[in-house]
């Protein structure tokens, strides 16, 4: 066996049009089987990015044409200052929230819609779901995760949001079958999903 080191090419950006902010790298209320995050044994670890760091990132990129700010993490909505961060980012551009949807309920969605309406920009939701079968999905994400995502989708649609589903084909199933089954579920909850990443 030969050891080798490969260097990836450096690409010069002509402009910065997307800004990714990882609000937390360790705080999540799910323990998905496929997750890359090495969660600490101590569940009290708080590794939230500071609001000042986010302000600095927004200031440092003020001359860039940012089209979207992506709030990621483990679970970004666990950040204690999430609402303030969202408002701050919405002053600058569209905001996309990558979430497992466990913090999304009708009360939260009403609040988020009000925040979006106060802004010139849009909030985009990317919701994680890994299987069309409740038992298989919850085997990956934890009990109740499947129903929570469906509830979140319904609440978001009710208030005019159009969530994007992020699906991991954990069981390596036929993609066409997977998509057909998800389409059937989406129809049942009156969510008209389009597929553009398969």
Residue ranges and their predicted role:
Residues 42-56, 74-118, 125, 129-135, ...:
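Canonical radical SAM enzyme core domain
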Residues 3-11:
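A detector for short, charged/polar N-terminal pre-domain segments
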Residues 10-52:
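Canonical Radical SAM [4Fe-4S] cluster-binding loop centered on the CxxxCxxC motif
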Residues 56-64:
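A short, N-terminal amphipathic alpha-helix
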Residues 19, 108-115, 182-187:
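Short, well-ordered amphipathic alpha-helices
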Residues 61, 89, 112, 153-156:
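Generic structural signal for hydrophobic
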Residues 64-70, 96, 119-129, 147-198:
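Conserved C-terminal portion of the radical SAM core fold
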């Amino acid at each position: 066996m030969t050891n080798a080191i490969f260097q990836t090419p450096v690409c010069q950006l002509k402009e910065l049009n997307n800004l990714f902010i990882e609000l937390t790298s360790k705080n999540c209320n799910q323990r998905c089987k496929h997750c890359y995050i090495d969660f600490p044994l101590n569940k009290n670890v708080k590794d939230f990015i500071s609001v000042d760091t986010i302000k600095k990132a927004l200031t440092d990129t003020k001359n860039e044409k940012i089209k979207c700010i992506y709030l990621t993490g483990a679970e970004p909505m666990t950040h204690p200052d999430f609402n303030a961060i969202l408002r701050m980012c919405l002053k600058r551009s569209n905001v996309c929230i990558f979430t497992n949807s466990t913090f999304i309920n009708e009360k939260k969605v009403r609040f988020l819609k009000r925040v979006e309406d106060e802004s010139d920009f849009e909030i985009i939701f990317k919701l994680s779901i890994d299987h069309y079968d409740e038992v298989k999905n919850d085997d990956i994400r934890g009990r109740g995760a499947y129903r929570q995502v469906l509830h979140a989708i319904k609440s978001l649609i009710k208030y005019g949001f159009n969530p994007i589903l992020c699906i991991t084909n954990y069981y390596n199933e036929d993609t066409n079958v997977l998509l057909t089954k998800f389409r059937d579920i989406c129809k049942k909850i009156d969510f008209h999903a389009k597929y553009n990443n398969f």
